[in-house]
From Swiss-Prot:
GO cellular component, one term: plasma membrane
Location of the protein in the cell: Cell membrane
Organism: Methanocaldococcus jannaschii (strain ATCC 43067 / DSM 2661 / JAL-1 / JCM 10045 / NBRC 100440)
Co-factor requirement: Zn(2+)
Residue ranges crossing the lipid bilayer per the database entry: 20-40, 73-93, 110-130, 133-153, 171-191
Protein name: Putative zinc metalloprotease MJ0611
Keyword Acyltransferase: no
Catalytic residues identified in the record: E50
One GO MF term: metallopeptidase activity
Family matches, as CDD domains: S2P-M50_like_1
Keyword Hydrolase: yes
UniProt keyword annotations, A-Z: Cell membrane, Hydrolase, Membrane, Metal-binding, Metalloprotease, Protease, Transmembrane, Transmembrane helix, Zinc
GO BP annotations, alphabetical order: proteolysis
Length: 191
């Protein structure tokens, strides 16, 4: 299955999920500008994270496709609107193959958080290039922090997160990738 082939349902699910996530991250200070910053910074992190899982799974001969979890999106809206809490559980890439080795499963899982790290680097470059206070500078700051946060969150070593699959496959790789990212995530949460 080609990595560039998307079903109509997958396109709809990805679109609805990314718009919902952008809204959740832009509320309560919602404006078109804040929404656009959120869409670029958070939306790109979410989309590329999920599509990298999908791409690596297809490399291993598995059928894979993103499916939205509409209940999770609704819960995210309710928690944000009622309590001001940010919760995102937009869906996941569903993977089907008769058998995936622990190594294949671990590499599929690791692909998402590593993509967020790569995106964080790109956003960091934006922060360095553009003048503080400019739109691209703010996109850079938000994109840098949120992508490292997403990578750390996904590397938690508990099901259903990516970190659990990586740890089962290779504890050393989980430690050198996951621990710094989880540390950064915790720093962001409590600093």
């Amino acid at each position: 299955m080609s990595i560039f082939r998307f079903s109509q349902r997958e396109i709809i699910d990805l679109t609805i999920s990314v718009l919902a996530i952008a809204f959740i991250f832009s509320y309560p200070n919602f404006s078109i500008l804040v929404f656009i910053i959120s869409l670029i910074a958070v939306g790109s992190g979410f989309i590329f994270h999920e599509l990298m899982h999908r791409t690596v799974a297809r490399k291993y001969g598995a059928w894979s496709e993103f499916r939205a979890w509409y209940e999770g999106l609704i819960l995210g809206f309710i928690l944000k609107l009622v309590f001001g809490a940010t919760f995102i559980a937009p869906g996941a890439v569903y993977i089907y193959k008769d058998y995936l080795t622990p190594e294949e499963n671990g590499k599929i899982a690791l692909a998402g958080p590593l993509t967020n790290v790569a995106l964080a680097f790109v956003f960091f470059i934006l922060m360095l290039i553009f003048k503080p206070g400019s739109l691209l500078y703010w996109i850079g700051i938000f994109g840098f922090h949120i992508n490292l946060f997403l990578a750390g969150f996904n590397m938690l070593p508990i099901p259903p997160f990516d970190g659990e699959k990586v740890l089962k496959w290779n504890p050393f790789i989980w430690a050198i990738v996951g621990l710094p990212l989880i540390g950064y995530m915790l720093y962001m949460m409590f600093w």
